[in-house]
Amino acid sequence: MKRIVTFVLLIFCALPVLCSQTSAPPKRHISCRFTQIWNIPSCYNKQSDLSEAWLYAIISVMVFCSTIFALAIYPYLDIGWNAIDAMNHPTFPAPNVIPLQQVIAPINQPRPPSPTPTEISYFNLTGGDD
């Protein structure tokens, strides 16, 4: 698998270098939107040696190859659903640590009164358990 990845990366790195030596750079226009691939041939003044069909075929093959390549390397990446141990911290709380100073309640203090209930009972309104 490492050989295939290295070979594909080498091809993708060498391809622009080889293509730039054989052709002149095209003129750029501000109105070119590369998200609309059907407008790519009309963005440049210089006509290409390849027809539009070849251009679309090359783009389609590159999209297909990159999709296959991405699906091939996805199981080896620790992202998304594959990231089982992405967070290397325990899911359970840490064990209790003994504090340096224990809080001790005074011995002779009376208990604080219980808080008043937030609801009024029916029996409190009627006068008891009659």
Swiss-Prot record:
Post-translation: what modifications? Phosphorylated on serine; O-glycosylated, but not N-glycosylated.
Q: How does it sit in the membrane?
A: Single-pass membrane protein
Q: Which GO terms describe its biological process?
A: regulation of signal transduction
Keywords of the record, alphabetical order, are:
Early protein, Glycoprotein, Host membrane, Membrane, Phosphoprotein, Signal, Transmembrane, Transmembrane helix
Q: Where is the signal peptide?
A: 1-19
| Keyword presence, Membrane | yes
Membrane-spanning segments: 53-77
Superkingdom field: Viruses
- Principal location class: host cell
User: Where's it found, cell-wise?
Assistant: Host membrane
Recorded GO cellular component terms are: host cell membrane; membrane
Q: Which family does it belong to?
A: Belongs to the adenoviridae E3_14 family.
Sum up the protein's function in the record's words. Down-regulates the EGF receptor and prevents cytolysis by TNF.
Q: What is this protein called?
A: Early E3B 14.5 kDa protein
Organism source for this protein?
Human adenovirus C serotype 6
Mind giving the lineage of the organism this protein is from?
Viruses, Varidnaviria, Bamfordvirae, Preplasmiviricota, Tectiliviricetes
